[in-house]
Amino acid sequence: MRSRLTITALALLVGMAAAPVQVLAQSSDGTNSSVSKVLASSGAGFNVAAVRSLLNRGDAAVASGNLDQAKTDYDNARTAAKQLLAFYRDLSGAFRGLDARIPREMDSKGREALSLLAQANLRLAALFRRQNQPEVAVPVLVEVVRLMTPASSEGQKAYQSLIELGFVETPFAGAKSAK
C-alpha cells in the first residue's frame, strides 16, 4: 500500500510538472470557466493515455534494442495500469447506488485500464522470452489469462505462449478464433 501511494504521488508530480498549469477563474455563479485537468493530459497525466505512452516508449526501446529501458517502461505501464484499475474500482463502488453515471464511467475506464494491463503483461512476457527468461514470463502470462479470461484475444495469446513455453500442454479449444 505504501509503495502504491509513493508511486501515485510520483506520477502526480510528474504529471503536474510536465503539464502547463492554468489559473482557475471563477465566474460570478461560482463555476470554473477554465478548468485545468492536469491528470487528464495525454502522456503526462495519470490516466490510460499515460499508460499507452509508456507502452509506446517501451515498444520504441525494443525496436532500438534497448531492452533494459523497455523493461522499465513496461513495468511502469503495468504498475500505473494496476493503480488506475484499483482506483477506478474503488470509485465505482463508492458511487454505486448513488449516481449510476459515475460507476458506468469508472467501469468503462477500468475495462480500458485492464486491457492496457494485459497488453503491458504480454509485452513484458515477450521481452522475458526474448531474454531467455521463460520462468519469469510464466507468472505474467498466467496473470493475463486470469484477468482477461481464456476466451478473450489477450487471454488466448497468453495461453498460447504458455503452450509454446511448455508450461501447459493442452490446447484451448476456444482458441481457434484468436488472431
Feature locations, PLM:
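Structural signature of alpha-solenoid helical repeat junctions
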Residues: 49, 69, 97-98, 109-116, ...
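Short, charge-rich amphipathic alpha-helical segments embedded
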Residues: 72-102, 143-160
